[in-house]
Amino acid sequence: MKTLPIIEQHLHGAYGVDFNKAGINEIIKLSHKLRDDGIVGFFPTLVTDTVENTKRQISVIKKASKECSGILGIHLEGIFLNPIKKGIHNAEHFMALTIENYKKLEDEFIKIVTLAPELDNGLISYLREQRVKVQAGHCVGWVKNGERIDGVTHTFNAMSGISHKESSTALSALLNDEVYTEVIADGIHVQDDALKLLLKTKPQDKVILVSDALPITHSDKKEMVFADSLIYFDGKEARSASGTLAGSTKLLPDIIKILGKKNLFNPKYIENSYKYHNIEPKGELIWDDEFNIVEKNF
C-alpha cells in the first residue's frame, strides 16, 4: 500500500518531550524522530497553561520551526474550553472566549484553536478573520448566531455525546458535512462501533486521524506530569490519579496499523490533512501487508 507521508495536527509530544515545557533543541530532535516514523509535518499542540507559559512555548516552538520544516504551526487546545468537559486540562487557567483574552497570547504561528463554541463571545469570528482554523472541543454545545467552525477536536471525547433526546456536539459533528472531524482511533478513546458510525456518517474527505499523543508516548517512563497532573501509564493507556483518561500513548503510524488490522483504514484519511491545511501533497510511504512502513520517500 502507498500513502502520502503523515501530517499530525494534534499531538502534545512524544519520546518524553512535552511541547508545554520543551526547549528548542528538544523539539528539533523530536521533529527528526517523528520524521523517521513517517510523520513529515505536525502541529505542536499546547495544553491549557498560564498565559505566561503559553506565550513562552509559542516563542520556543516558533524558533524551533526555523531549524526544521516539519513544524507547520501551533494547535492551541487549551484555555478557551468548557470546565464541564475539561478532561485532563487544568480549569484554573481557563479564560472567557473573548478577543481581548486571545490577544494576550495571539501569534501568527497559531494555526488551530480548539474552543467551546457555546461559550463564544466574538472570538470565533475574529479567529476566522485571521484565517485560524476553529475547532469545537471540550464542550457541550455548538456554534451560535450563524457562526461557522472548521472542525471538531477528538470527536466523541470531552464533548456532549449522542442522545436521542437532545442536541449535542457529537451529533452536530456527525450531521454537518462541511466540518472536519478529528478522531483518536487508537482502540481506547473511541469504541469500535462509534468509530464505524463516524466513518459511515461523515464524508470520507472530512475525517482526520489524530493521535493526541502524550509526551510519555514511545518513552520508557511509566509516569509523568502533564497539564499539572501526574499521569500514570500502565502499558496500555494513560490516566490521572483520579482515573481521567488522558491523550493517547500511540503515534499515528501505530493507529493506522490498528485501523488496518480492523479493515477500517482508508488512505484518504491521510490525504485529508493536506487538504484541510492547503498543503501540497508530496512524497510517499510504502506499507507492507501488516501495515508497517517499509519505505519512506520524501
Regions found by a protein language model. Give the residues of each.
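Di-metal (Zn2+ and/or Mg2+/Mn2+) metal-binding site signature of metallo-dependent hydrolases
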Residues: 2-24
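Divalent metal-binding pocket/active-site signature
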Residues: 76, 83-168
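Active-site-adjacent C-terminal substructures of enzyme catalytic domains
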Residues: 143-264
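C-terminal cap of metal-dependent C-N hydrolases
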Residues: 274-275, 280-298
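Residue-level marker for buried hydrophobic side chains located in beta-strands
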Residues: 5-7, 74, 134-136, 207-210
